[in-house]
Amino acid sequence: MILTVKPLQGKECSVQVTEDEKVSTVKELVSERLNIPANQQRLLYKGKALSDEHRLSDYSIGPEAKLNLVIRPVGERTGASGTAASSSSSSQGRVWQTVSTILARHFSPADAAKVHEQLIKDYERSLRQLSLDDIERLAGRLLHPDGEGMDTSYMD
């Protein structure tokens, strides 16, 4: 099958693969065609990041599919940097602690724990369901709050 790989900025390329190929193989083919090292590539399908060790069939990627390519800056690790991760983790911990404190004021300890647990599950589910389009819209709203020079007709 033929897949189209489109960088966020730049020319797209097509690669011929089977549905049993691993994502890492697709990255190697893209590397040959676009001269972008595989370790700097992040492939997305329908807004979801693809993991190197998984097969295309694991993501139900079929013929004629279009993958988006995000190019990582040189030196950026696959995961978040240690400082950013710990900072984000500690601020997230503070948020959940604040939520827990507020719930404790209004519910019994058992009920507060249930509500707290459900809030965390719902939050994590919502994050997993974010697509690249959702993130781009959010970024556009944050970076251009006045909507200057931006087509806002598609925004809800």
Swiss-Prot record:
Keywords: Cytoplasm, Nucleus, Transport. The keyword Lipid biosynthesis does not apply. It is found in: Cytoplasm, Cytosol; Nucleus. One of its GO terms (cellular component) is BAT3 complex. It holds the Pfam family Tugs. GO terms for biological process: post-translational protein targeting to endoplasmic reticulum membrane; tail-anchored membrane protein insertion into ER membrane. Its main location: cytoplasm. GO terms for molecular function: protein-folding chaperone binding. Residues 1-76 form the Ubiquitin-like domain. SUPFAM superfamilies: Ubiquitin-like. As part of a cytosolic protein quality control complex, the bag6/bat3 complex, maintains misfolded and hydrophobic patches-containing proteins in a soluble state and participates in their proper delivery to the endoplasmic reticulum or alternatively can promote their sorting to the proteasome where they undergo degradation. The bag6/bat3 complex is involved in the post-translational delivery of tail-anchored/type II transmembrane proteins to the endoplasmic reticulum membrane. Component of the bag6/bat3 complex. This is Ubiquitin-like protein 4A. It comes from Anoplopoma fimbria (Sablefish). The gene is ubl4a.
